[in-house]
């Protein structure tokens, strides 16, 4: 019996009980006369109009008669709609409702109203919502499943940075909830999964292959901005941030990755300096060089660069002037002050020895960066620039300690980028110190390394913070985690109009186009000259844009990290291929990577991409930065006494000892 016939019978039965002596009239259509019962009689038309139940019955009779002819097609259509609904997901994104179809044959959701297939890989074997409860709703439309930009996927917040409170969860039917605690990989706005019940666990994206059709998947995991590859020998994951365009580029990229992995094997994970006998076999000898190689260079501070007096930067053991407004341990430190800072600290190292025969590591306190800097803007010949580099190599060559291992157990700390010491004939910039054959074996610690030199090791730029005790670090950690962030994004820098490869102008335009989300501090007009201005900007921001400048690396990356601002990296050579001892291999834990080529070709809007990051993602990253990374990114006071933490200097020295033990 059809649904309409059954309902008609119930209505007739009910009417006959209430009005046994009245017959229900039936309206006659002008186009088609429905078949009527023999018992039906014509009643009073006025009563027909006055009685609403009678009108309803008239309309129902028409529907019943017409549906009789279409009973079979309507039944089929009704069943098809049920099937369609049970295999679809309604996705609410802003003011748009997307209907997305999934099936056991398709591992992707195909959104009929999206206009394209956004490649949303769904782990269908791991969680399934009831068919009738697939409509995603959210309180105040805060936390919804959206189609992200450029094919992103997943759960994101429809938030502007200035408004409203974040809801803790969005309900999806009775059993399915979207918890903000559940993160997927932390890289894109969509890498979040819903948990059907308490026992279910989120699946990391790189492991989704185990629940999907193996034949339909690529060999390597492809995220929007980088590729997760696997080492066939070790099974460990590797990150590819761009695809080599030529065979030479591929060779260079493989060398970079190989040297990065080698350097990570030298990283010392523990702190055993304070254990009894911890300096056994770890003596460090500091050469007492003629003053022309270090102290005399600092005395030229007033004439080092034409437009600035560097003398103030060399106060307080080269930390610079104290920033009283910031409190204890904060100084106006220059980015090129690493050499004297490291020298002051190593002179007080607990494993320092004064007898060369007791040493395993030899430190050469040559301020090569200061030597390069003083000639940068002076019209002198290359021979003049190479005077001290040639003399230091000659001086070392006279030492038995150098000749014993051909310099393999020696270390230089150079406070500029590697390329400033690798001048070739056609250029006039810098010195040729690191191009000398004698300099191949020693370890070179620099603020930016040559990725194709395994003995070039990058260590952090000096920041503004130089704590003296564990308490100083702990107080700052608590303070920065509790600091409200009034801006979503910030950028402190200047455009590079003469560099066609620079993306800075594009980022500045995007930032200025979204003043509610992004703040721009223009360094061209002196806005960055005052350290406090940069600190205030980063301390108030969730994300800090870090595009390459004159070279890939930036002091600003480390300034942002110690201020709790998540760095946005556009070039892997800015950080990921540099600081193997101080930054973890998994960049997603502390940064956001956006390929600079995508920015240059305007395939991505950086502001929109960062707006898609959830509050929980931001908080998790900041917590990791502040608790796990921050202590190891700062150079402590020259008299620092750390028991609980290791600062950047401690990590560097411990790892140097391990490197020498493995390679000499």
From Swiss-Prot:
Entry keyword set: Glycoprotein, Glycosyltransferase, Golgi apparatus, Membrane, Signal-anchor, Transferase, Transmembrane, Transmembrane helix
Biological processes per GO annotation: cell wall biogenesis; polysaccharide biosynthetic process; protein glycosylation; root hair elongation
Compartments where found: Golgi apparatus membrane
Membrane-side (Lumenal) residue stretches: 93-664
Bilayer topology annotation: Single-pass type II membrane protein
Transmembrane helix recorded as keyword: yes
Bias (Basic residues) ranges: 1-21
Name under which the protein is recorded: Xyloglucan-specific galacturonosyltransferase 1
Organism expressing this protein natively: Arabidopsis thaliana (Mouse-ear cress)
Highest classification ranks of the organism: Eukaryota, Viridiplantae, Streptophyta, Embryophyta, Tracheophyta
Gene this protein is translated from: GT16
């Amino acid at each position: 019996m059809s649904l309409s016939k059954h309902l008609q019978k119930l209505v007739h039965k009910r009417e006959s009980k209430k009005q046994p002596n009245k017959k229900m009239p039936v309206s006659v259509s002008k186009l088609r006369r429905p078949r009527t019962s023999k018992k039906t009689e014509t009643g009073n038309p006025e009563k027909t109009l006055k009685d609403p139940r009678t009108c309803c019955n008239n309309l129902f009779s028409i529907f019943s008669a017409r549906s009789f002819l279409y009973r079979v097609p309507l039944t089929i259509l009704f069943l098809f709609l049920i099937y369609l609904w049970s295999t679809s997901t309604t996705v609410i994104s802003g003011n748009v409702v997307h209907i997305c179809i999934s099936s056991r044959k398709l591992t992707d959701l195909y959104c009929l109203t999206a206009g394209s297939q956004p490649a949303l890989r769904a782990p269908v074997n791991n969680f399934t919502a009831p068919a009738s409860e697939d409509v995603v709703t959210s309180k105040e439309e805060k936390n919804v499943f959206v189609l992200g930009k450029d094919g992103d996927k997943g759960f994101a917040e429809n938030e502007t940075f200035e408004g409203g409170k974040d809801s803790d969860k969005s309900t999806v039917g009775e059993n399915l909830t979207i918890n903000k605690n559940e993160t997927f990989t932390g890289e894109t706005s969509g890498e979040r999964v819903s948990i059907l019940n308490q026992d279910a666990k989120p699946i990391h994206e790189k492991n989704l292959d185990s629940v999907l059709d193996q034949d339909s998947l690529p060999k390597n995991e492809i995220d929007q901005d980088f590729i997760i590859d696997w080492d066939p020998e070790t099974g460990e994951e590797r990150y590819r941030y761009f695809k080599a365009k030529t065979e030479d580029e591929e060779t260079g990229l493989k060398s970079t990755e190989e040297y990065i992995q080698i350097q990570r094997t030298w990283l010392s994970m523990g702190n055993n300096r304070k254990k009894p006998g911890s300096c056994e076999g770890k003596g460090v000898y500091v050469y007492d060089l003629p003053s022309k190689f270090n102290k005399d260079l600092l005395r030229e501070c007033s004439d080092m660069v034409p437009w600035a007096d560097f003398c103030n930067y060399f106060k307080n053991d080269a930390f610079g002037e104290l920033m009283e407004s910031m409190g204890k341990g904060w100084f106006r430190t220059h980015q090129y002050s690493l050499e004297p800072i490291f020298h002051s600290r190593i002179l007080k190292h607990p494993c320092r020895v004064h007898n060369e025969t007791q040493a395993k590591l030899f430190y050469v306190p040559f301020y090569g960066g200061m030597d390069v800097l003083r000639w940068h803007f002076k019209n002198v010949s290359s021979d003049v620039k190479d005077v001290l580099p040639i003399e230091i190599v000659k001086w070392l060559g006279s030492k038995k300690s150098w000749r014993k291992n051909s310099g393999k157990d020696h270390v230089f700390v150079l406070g500029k980028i590697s390329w400033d010491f690798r001048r070739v004939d056609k250029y006039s910039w810098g010195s040729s110190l690191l191009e000398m054959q004698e300099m191949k074996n020693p370890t070179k610690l620099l603020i930016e390394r040559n990725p194709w030199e395994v003995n070039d090791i990058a260590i952090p730029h000096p920041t503004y913070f130089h704590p003296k005790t564990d308490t100083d670090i702990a107080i700052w950690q608590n303070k920065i985690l509790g600091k409200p962030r009034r801006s979503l994004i910030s950028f402190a820098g200047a455009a590079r109009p003469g560099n066609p490869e620079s993306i800075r102008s594009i980022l500045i335009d995007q930032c200025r186009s979204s003043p509610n989300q992004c703040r721009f501090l223009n360094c061209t007009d002196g806005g960055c000259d005052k350290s406090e201005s940069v600190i205030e900007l980063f301390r108030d921001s969730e994300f800090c844009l870090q595009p390459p400048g004159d070279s890939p690396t930036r002091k600003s990356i480390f300034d942002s990290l110690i201020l709790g601002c998540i760095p946005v990296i556009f070039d892997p050579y800015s950080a990921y291929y540099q600081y193997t001892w101080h930054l973890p291999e998994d960049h997603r834990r502390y940064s956001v990577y956006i390929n600079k080529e995508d920015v240059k070709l305007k395939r991505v809007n950086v502001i929109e991409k960062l707006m898609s990051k959830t509050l929980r993602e931001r908080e998790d990253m900041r917590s990791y930065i502040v608790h796990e990374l921050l202590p190891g990114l700062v150079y402590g006071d020259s008299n620092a006494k750390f028991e609980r933490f290791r600062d950047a200097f401690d990590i560097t020295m411990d790892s140097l000892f391990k490197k020498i033990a493995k390679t000499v």
